[in-house]
């Protein structure tokens, strides 16, 4: 089971809808046509309501757990990613003719990359599925992030470069 607000998975290429519990990561209809396309989540955000707030009692990106494809009973793998600061950049704002410019400082994440957000959810989902190993293809930040989160989860990690 996943997010209460996840309605389905939809293929952006062929527009087919699949149940959110589908046990595949590539659209079967497109694979039959020689195309590898990942279905994207379709959320029913109308069910959130105007008073919805992130759950600040959850670590990192899991404050937004209601919107993530993670079962309510799954313990998240988090290194307290996210909640990175916005840093004012007045000189650059002036040079660009902007009244104000804020730059998100993602180097404050555990592996110094915004990829930590994806790694936290991906490794949590892998553990939820019963995996003991995660495998990724990366030449940099994504591999480092997944390796860190896999280690935190007690899982093996293979990074293909």
Where are the regions that the model predicts?
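PLP-dependent amino-acid enzyme catalytic core
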Residues: 1-161
């Amino acid at each position: 089971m996943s997010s209460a607000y996840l309605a389905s998975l939809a293929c952006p290429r062929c527009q087919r809808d699949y149940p959110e519990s589908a046990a595949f990561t590539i659209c079967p209809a497109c694979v039959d046509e020689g195309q590898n396309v990942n279905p994207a989540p379709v959320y029913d955000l109308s069910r959130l309501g105007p008073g919805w707030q992130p759950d600040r009692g959850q670590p990192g990106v899991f404050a937004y757990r209601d919107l993530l494809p993670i079962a309510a009973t799954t313990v998240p793998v988090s290194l307290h990613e996210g909640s990175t600061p916005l840093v004012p950049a007045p000189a650059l704002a002036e040079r660009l003719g902007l009244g104000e410019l804020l730059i998100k400082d993602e180097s404050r994440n555990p592996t110094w990359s915004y990829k930590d957000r994806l790694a936290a959810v991906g490794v949590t989902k892998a553990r939820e599925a019963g995996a003991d190993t995660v495998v990724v293809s990366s030449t940099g930040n994504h591999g480092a992030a997944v390796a860190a989160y896999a280690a935190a989860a007690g899982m093996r990690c293979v990074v293909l470069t």
